[in-house]
Amino acid sequence: MKRVNIVGLSDKDKRSSLNEIRILSSLNHPNIIDYKEAFFDENTKTLNIVMEYAENGDIENKVKENLKHRLRFREKTIWEWLIQILEGLKYLHDNKIMHRDLKCANIFLTKDGRLKLGDLNVSIIAQMGMAKTQTGIA
């Protein structure tokens, strides 16, 4: 679950949070984190975004763990991950969405070994061949 403290956020940041919810709710692909629900907690003044849980964390932590133990990823694993990342990106691009913050910390690994792209709060929608920040609320 992602918690966004709404108090003190700029209007732009609030719109960005709402945009992430709108984008996530419209996506359905095996390599994109699933959106579950969102709710506003009046007590804590936070917007709570419930997303699919990736049991094996993110790729950034896997890389750090391997470096710590001087382990290497198998080439086959790297290729499988690359293909899954590209399939997720293709799906986003086919839907005129650019991730804009693709990094190991935003690529998650499920318990069955599937990679999923997440954290789309800086995503933008491409319109008429030009990328524009999406600020509307659906």
Which residue stretches match the model-derived regions?
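Activation segment signature within eukaryotic-like protein kinase domains
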Residues: 81-82
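A short, aromatic-enriched beta-strand patch in the conserved N-lobe beta-sheet
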Residues: 37-39
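Catalytic-loop of the protein kinase fold
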Residues: 93-109
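Conserved N-lobe beta3->alphaC-helix segment of eukaryotic protein kinase catalytic domains
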Residues: 3-27
